[in-house]
Amino acid sequence: MQVTVKTFAQTREITGEDNIALNLSKNSTIETVISQLKARSDKWALALEGSVLTACNQELCDLQTELSDGDELALFPPVTGG
């Protein structure tokens, strides 16, 4: 199955990528995607270290959410500031 991963803010700036198509095996979870992305390069590992807010098809979800073919996964860095 294929999913589209979208990145925003600091994650996009660090990786230099905004949309990525990933081929995954059936029953893959968001945690699987994050692990695969971290293994891609040091930039991805840095961008996804710590907590990441995730949304699947524009709904907030947790790391154990199973993905389906055609899903859109958005990865947001934690909100910071003061």
Which sequence ranges carry the predicted segments?
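Ubiquitin-like/PB1-type beta-grasp interaction modules and other compact soluble beta-rich domains
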Residues: 1-80
